[in-house]
Amino acid sequence: MNIVITGGAGFLGARLARTLLAQGPLALAGAAPQPISRITLVDRAQPPADLLADSRVATVVGDLNDLLRPGPSGTMAIAADTQLVFHLAAAVSGECEADFDLGMRSNLDATRALLEACRTLKTGPTFVFASSLAVFGKAPGQSLPEVIEDNTLPTPQSSYGIQKFIGEQLVADYARKGFVRGRNVRLMTVSVRPGKPNGAASSFLSGMIREPLAGQRAVCPVPADVAVALSSPGRTIDGLIRAAETTDADWGPLTAMNLPALRTSVREMAEALGRVAGSAAANLLDWTPDPAIIRVVSTWPGAIAATRARALGLLPDASFEAIIRDYIRENPDAIRLPVQP
């Protein structure tokens, strides 16, 4: 089986590639398991060294729109024998608010160009689109349902959320026409991400844990009572792979599926940090409001019902403390403070 991962050099893309390579044969859409022959990682940068060293990994470096542009230099990102595409490449929420044109190019134009490239293939590829809970938003003067269901009407309140919702509809229509097998998956906010902060409005939800564990100060830019819907990196990858594996009958409608989320609050996250790493870590948090971040994050839902995902065997993380401990176990070199057993 030949697989393409856009955004393959990023944190989630690289982790997805490692997981696929480690787990062996993949049962695509319920078919008989096939060994993975090649994973092509498409991104603006090279992936980590361990992936480059794997003979099953190919890389394509460049802007996705340029790589898919018709002509001699185009379509490098998707080979004729591609059977599965994970479309993770995106400009993130904060970037899209700061640069409207960047968001439209990265999240809308590139998604349609990739779907068009898949349309030309004779393989009828499975197309797993990484959407976002940002398709749901609280409009000024209005309220969201207390719990967001799979079929709750999206009301995005950011450019990023709108672009992701349009992407969902494009994937659904290309699937309806039989060009691809569509799998729209709404990712929750992923925490704790290792490495450096990115431009997402939700970046602090990793930074407020990651930086204190490294002995560094971190800013929490929203009130402590803000509710958030989170998923660990591992559970997020599980959801993407399960979407690729499930049969059309088990998947159900072409509309998007919410991944399971742990419902918590920023205060509870800080308290979990204190239980794991003590007051030395908790005291490194600076509660400094940022109106721009508050304006975006406060529109997002804090409680998600993932009925379809649960029917596929996917479950939320048990607790945020468990998420922190997973991060510590997976990133021992990034931890500078003593942690409680």
Regions found by a protein language model. Give the residues of each.
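Catalytic helix-loop patch of NAD(P)-dependent Rossmann-fold dehydrogenases
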Residues: 105, 140-184, 191
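Glycine-rich Rossmann NAD(P)(H)-binding loop
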Residues: 191-194, 220-230, 243, 252-264
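NAD(P)H-binding glycine-rich loop region in Rossmannoid oxidoreductase-like domains
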Residues: 61-106
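N-terminal Rossmann NAD(P)H-binding glycine-rich loop of SDR-like oxidoreductase domains
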Residues: 1-26
